[in-house]
Regions:
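Hydrophobic alpha-helical membrane-embedded or membrane-associated segments
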Residues: 65-69, 73, 142, 170, ...
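Transmembrane alpha-helical segments
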Residues: 45-53, 141-152, 198-211, 255-270
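Hydrophobic alpha-helical segments of polytopic membrane proteins
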Residues: 156-168, 203-229
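Membrane-cytosol interface segments of multi-pass membrane proteins
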Residues: 1-174, 184-185
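Interfacial loop-to-helix transition and helix-capping segments at the boundaries
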Residues: 27-38, 123-138, 180-199, 234-261
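Alpha-helical transmembrane segments and terminal signal-anchor/GPI-anchor hydrophobic tails
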Residues: 213-277
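Loop-centered beta-sheet repeat module
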Residues: 166-210
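Hydrophobic alpha-helical transmembrane segments
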Residues: 7-18, 132-136, 191-202, 262-271
Length: 277
């Protein structure tokens, strides 16, 4: 029997994807969107987290769905590097450096392709065209670490609730990730992973604590309140998870939770509509 899909979660994913596209297209509200849109995906992943089947099965599944696509995509971009140079998709012209977010690209050899693929396998670096895959890398690292910690805690606590120790661990990692961001340290993307672990954890907490039966008018009030909070936060600081940058750990948590409330209430209000089903 096919697994029953949650229309609200599907709607939240859809809203998140739309926000991501808008945020990367010069949309006037980009700074507002960046406050929470990537945190939303980590939290959704935490919401859907399950160790059913055991940690080995979980790790194998994540290797196929996250690690392998990361390696294959970056390897493909490297193999096609010289073709992209000829087509002017990439360039060796140093004037490109005047445009933020770009880099000078040089031709590669077969040796370069092999060597760089080895680096992709351990998340060491990336390609210019594959820059957006930082999320895939971070989600893989966070998911695997969370699963291992969960498995160890279940063994140590003999089946007792792991929510509190996981929360303490995520708090420590959030502080470490924030300090890494301030220091500019992000080897193998571990600084970003440390910061985002708490977002994954929040998703697991929200799944256990969220009330489903809420009157429609209350959902509208919650969404409006969350929107107002995000407007205020947007004047106080910013979030850029791709570079492990955020004003403070508390700021990241507040913006992420407000964004979750806004998107979830919007999804709950729109999921029953015929055009969304």
């Amino acid at each position: 029997m096919a697994k029953q899909r949650d229309p609200v979660i599907d709607s939240m994913r859809g809203i998140g994807i739309v926000l991501m596209v808008l945020g990367h297209s010069g949309f006037p509200g980009t700074d507002f969107i960046y406050l929470f849109h990537m945190a939303l995906f980590f939290m959704l992943s935490g919401w859907l987290f399950s160790l059913r089947g055991g940690p080995v099965h979980f790790i194998k599944r994540k290797a196929v769905t996250l690690w392998l696509p990361f390696v294959l995509a970056n390897t493909a971009f490297t193999v096609l590097n010289n073709l992209f140079l000829k087509l002017n998709i990439l360039t060796s012209d140093e004037r490109i450096l005047q445009v933020p977010g770009n880099a000078v690209t040089t031709p590669v050899t077969v040796k370069d392709v092999i060597g760089r693929t080895v680096h992709w396998c351990v998340f060491d670096g990336g390609t210019q065209l594959g820059g957006a895959m930082w999320f895939i890398q971070a989600l893989f690292q966070v998911s695997i670490l969370y699963a291992l910690v969960e498995f160890i805690l279940q063994r140590l606590l003999h089946g007792a609730d792991t929510l509190l120790p996981q929360g303490l661990f995520s708090g420590v990692l959030l502080w470490v990730g924030w300090r890494c961001g301030l220091a500019g340290w992000n080897v193998w993307g571990l600084g970003i992973a440390a910061s985002c672990y708490c977002l994954f954890y929040l998703g697991t907490v929200l799944r256990r604590t969220t009330r489903e039966s809420i009157p429609t008018y209350q959902r509208g009030i919650f969404a409006a309140a969350a929107f107002a909070v995000l407007l205020i936060l947007g004047r106080l600081g910013s979030v850029g998870l791709a570079g492990n940058g955020y004003s403070s750990p508390i700021f990241l948590l507040a913006a992420s939770l407000a964004g979750w409330v806004l998107v979830r209430e919007a999804a709950c209000l729109t999921a029953p509509l015929p055009c969304v089903r």
